[in-house]
Amino acid sequence: MNAQREPSGLERLEQALDYRFTQSDLLQLALTHRSAPLDGSKAGEVVATTHNERLEFLGDSVLNLIVSHRLYKRFGEVPEGQLSQWRAMLVNTRSLSEVAKDLELGRYLRMGRGEAKSGGREKYSILGNALEALLGAIYLDGGFEAAERVVDRLFAHQVAGIEPEQQGKDYKTLLQEYLQARGEALPIYAVLSAEGPPHERVFVVSCHPREQLCGHGQGRSKREAEQHAAQQALELLIESENEHHD
């Protein structure tokens, strides 16, 4: 009786994805960081001229479209701004890296010795980018429906966890999470004015998440004004990011 063959490393990854590549070179390319040496070269001498960044570009668009469609179908009465915020939370670098870690994606990546020694297999940005590249590779290999199935499998828990009555209300927290996921500093809030008698005072607050970007908010309390300022700042950031992707 023949012993059952143990799956190879990449076969284990395919099992975790529940998708088997017909073009194995696409899978290899998706897992190749730009620091990886060319085959046969010494580490650090010649870096790969083919790496996963173009696939990452493609996978980013594929992922955004699929997640956008899922949110659009599930939340029929939710306005565009709120859908954009939920999508940003689902596909930000930290969220992607967590999905990548569940797949143990770091262990399969090809990268240079220096990058690996500096913790490259655990870096949020590298893991998130590799996951997007993987989705781009699946799209090229099996088409959009195959990519949809994999995204649904990987992100089902996150999408199911969104509850309209609980999410999207604390804009200060949403803004903080958005910035932290991108490795940016926390926003700076400042009270611009506080006018009127104590029982009818109106506060105007500014929120600076980045040097050249500012949100403004008004409210009957400082906290309410900060929430409105954070909401506007977050919407401006998402709008800027969407324009960048376009």
From Swiss-Prot:
Active-site residue numbers: 60, 132
Cellular component aspect of the GO annotation: cytoplasm
Subcellular location, principal: cytoplasm
Keyword terms: Cytoplasm, Endonuclease, Hydrolase, Magnesium, Metal-binding, mRNA processing, Nuclease, RNA-binding, rRNA processing, rRNA-binding, tRNA processing
Residues reported in the UniProt entry to bind Mg(2+): 56, 129, 132
Catalytic activities: Endonucleolytic cleavage to 5'-phosphomonoester
Functional description taken from the UniProt entry: Digests double-stranded RNA. Involved in the processing of primary rRNA transcript to yield the immediate precursors to the large and small rRNAs (23S and 16S). Processes some mRNAs, and tRNAs when they are encoded in the rRNA operon. Processes pre-crRNA and tracrRNA of type II CRISPR loci if present in the organism.
Protein name listed in UniProt: Ribonuclease 3
Organism: Magnetococcus marinus (strain ATCC BAA-1437 / JCM 17883 / MC-1)
